[in-house]
């Protein structure tokens, strides 16, 4: 099992380099991803041990902020967020390896994107380790372009259908349900794919699906960036983007499993919260004008079948 974990780690670290290189190619000023490598000390007082590399870009003309973060950690006991739906795993040791990214563009017409790909192994050093994959990618637009959502979902469906034709409808629905702010009765965006506890096939079959899914992120996102990054926008557009970013913050801090897992397990706070947008605003009881571009967003982000 350790060999398989290392193989996935090698894939993720190479993917991290590929994604940051491609994103930098679309940046138009001197902003670059900086690498922040870290290691948790292997001491008795540390609940979580391991290492990682958080790659951050800030202040770009295209990407106002972005993070592509790799980590490999292990602990003596899975935190509550990881065992809430699988009580049989409570108290078990674990290894977790993953890559998580969030890209916050400067232009309000370019959507924010998020992706995550990970593996968990409980009882990794025993004769019967329990493994599962998780991940997916989702899109959060501020102003609607139907063709962008169709392209995003078509890319997701193509990858899923290559492996299992039941995956796309199942993981698309899961994504719509997961990225939902209960207290706002709003979806975070137009969704995409979300899956967890993936071990319904052999390890190699699941590995191949997850790596194909991860490799398709750039195919899904970069054409949208290229199409929208030069659209002129006003301060009104920017203000609405900042307001909607507030929803992103609310979701990450209240509902996101990765954030909760990281904080509960004693993870590296700077890396865990690096996905936060550089700026966000909240307005008391604000409502968009009837018939405005801003009002259309609230209809656009409701779950729907994007692929006719």
From Swiss-Prot:
GO cellular component: cytoplasm
Any one Gene Ontology molecular-function term assigned to this protein's record: coproporphyrinogen oxidase activity
Enzyme Commission number(s) from the entry: 1.3.3.3
Domain of life: Bacteria
Location of the region described as Important for dimerization in the Swiss-Prot/TrEMBL record: 248-283
Pathway involvement of the protein, from the record: Porphyrin-containing compound metabolism; protoporphyrin-IX biosynthesis; protoporphyrinogen-IX from coproporphyrinogen-III (O2 route): step 1/1
Binding residues for a divalent metal cation: 104, 114, 153, 183
Residues engaged in binding substrate: 100, 116-118, 266-268
Compartment(s) where it occurs, according to its Swiss-Prot or TrEMBL record: Cytoplasm
A single GO BP: protoporphyrinogen IX biosynthetic process
Necessary cofactors: a divalent metal cation
Sorted UniProt keywords: Cytoplasm, Heme biosynthesis, Metal-binding, Oxidoreductase, Porphyrin biosynthesis
Site (Important for dimerization): 183
N-terminal signal peptide: none
Function description: Involved in the heme biosynthesis. Catalyzes the aerobic oxidative decarboxylation of propionate groups of rings A and B of coproporphyrinogen-III to yield the vinyl groups in protoporphyrinogen-IX.
Name recorded for this polypeptide: Oxygen-dependent coproporphyrinogen-III oxidase
């Amino acid at each position: 099992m350790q060999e398989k974990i290392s193989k996935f780690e090698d894939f993720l670290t190479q993917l991290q380099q590929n994604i940051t290189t491609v994103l930098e190619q679309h940046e138009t000023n001197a902003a670059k991803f900086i690498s922040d490598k870290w290691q948790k000390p292997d001491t008795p007082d540390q609940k979580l041990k391991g290492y990682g590399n958080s790659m951050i870009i800030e202040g770009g003309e295209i990407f106002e902020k972005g993070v592509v973060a790799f980590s490999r950690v292990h602990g003596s006991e899975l935190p509550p967020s990881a065992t809430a739906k699988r009580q049989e795993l409570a108290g078990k040791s674990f290894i977790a390896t993953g890559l998580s990214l969030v890209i916050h563009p400067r232009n309000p017409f370019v959507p924010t994107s998020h992706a995550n790909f990970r593996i968990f192994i409980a009882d990794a050093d025993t004769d019967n380790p329990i493994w599962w994959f998780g991940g997916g990618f989702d899109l959060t637009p501020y102003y609607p372009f139907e063709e962008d959502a169709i392209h995003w979902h078509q890319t997701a469906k193509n990858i899923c259908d290559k492996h299992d034709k039941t995956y796309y409808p199942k993981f698309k629905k899961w994504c719509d349900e997961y990225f939902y702010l209960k207290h706002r009765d709003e979806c975070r965006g137009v969704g995409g794919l979300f899956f967890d506890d993936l071990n319904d096939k052999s390890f190699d079959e699941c590995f191949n699906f997850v790596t194909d899914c991860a490799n398709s992120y750039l195919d899904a996102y970069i054409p949208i960036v290229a199409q929208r990054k030069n659209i002129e926008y006003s301060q009104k557009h920017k203000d609405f983007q900042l307001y909607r970013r507030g929803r992103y913050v609310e979701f990450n801090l209240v509902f996101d499993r990765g954030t909760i897992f990281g904080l509960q397990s004693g993870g590296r706070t700077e890396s865990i919260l690096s996905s936060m947008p550089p700026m966000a605003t909240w307005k008391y009881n604000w409502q968009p004008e009837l018939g405005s571009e801003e009002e259309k967003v609230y209809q656009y982000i409701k779950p729907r079948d994007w692929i006719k």
